[in-house]
Amino acid sequence: NGPLAGLTLTAAVCRHRGMILGEGAQWERFPLLVKFIDANDDLSVQVHPGAAACAKHFPGGHSKDESWIVVDAEPGGRILAGTRPGGTREDFVRALEAGRVEECLQSIAARPGEVFRMAPGTVHALGRGVVILEIQEPSDTTFRLWDYNRLDDKGNPRELHVEQALLSMRFEATRAVEPQVETTEWGRRERLVRAPVYEIERLHIERGFTWETATDRPQVLVVLDGALTVEGGGESLQLGPGEAVIVPAALREVVCEPEGETTVATSRPTLDPGTG
């Protein structure tokens, strides 16, 4: 809205780089990708490399660190996150060749509200019937390990990237994040993830307050439950479940007014993307 009305995010960043990105004005693009994923089938088992793996094995590749907030899950919905304790690379390769790769992966029942960080090198997959909010580095470098023998639109097996994935993998399990909870005058703040390239918090807002961003970097607010009016810079927006707003770096405080108890996820970059 305001001077940015009608612009795509890419165009807005190009035209108002300093206002939106603040001290990150040198970034080539907006430093976060935030989206909902609603899995209507089991998604492919994949892994993303870290910066070190890209530098060593994949010149031109880009690291990807991502986190998931489980929004909804059907009965039996699950997440595959990391390898089972005690597993080795050799075990994994044998299982992969036999089409039994899931036996080597940690399967976790998906519970709304739980949060998982998929650090670079973590093998992961989203199961059917699970809805997540995904916050990540904007990167297309993905290596697919297993895709349940599915075919592409031409009837061919979908491409796998086993060799690249094995060079990127970390053979370790992943657990749900334990939030650091702080009671406030307006409700409750949960510090969820502090990764090298982003931070995530969850705000349970019971009454209106002025949110001081306390950083010269942009932030993304996503309403998970309830409704919220945000005011700042002479503008006002009403947000419902699933709706989001980017708070530019130049806007140092925002007035938040909930309609009943409202839950909001916030994320912001912490380093230049690609350094994690």
Segments (PLM) and residue ranges:
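Ligand-binding loop in jelly-roll beta-barrel domains
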Residues: 38-42, 50, 73-76, 122-142, ...
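An exposed, glycine/acidic-rich loop-and-rim segment of catalytic or binding clefts
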Residues: 104, 115-117, 122-177
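Short histidine-centered beta-strand/loop micro-motifs
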Residues: 24-25, 56-59, 191-192, 210-215, ...
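Short acidic-glycine-tyrosine-enriched beta hairpin
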Residues: 105-117, 131, 232-251
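Transition-metal
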Residues: 1-87, 147-175, 200, 273-276
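Active-site glycine-rich loop that binds ribose-phosphate moieties when present
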Residues: 87-117
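Acidic/His-leaning functional-site neighborhoods
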Residues: 178-243, 251-252
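A generic structural signal for well-ordered coil/turn residues at beta-strand boundaries
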Residues: 30, 41, 63-66, 75, ...
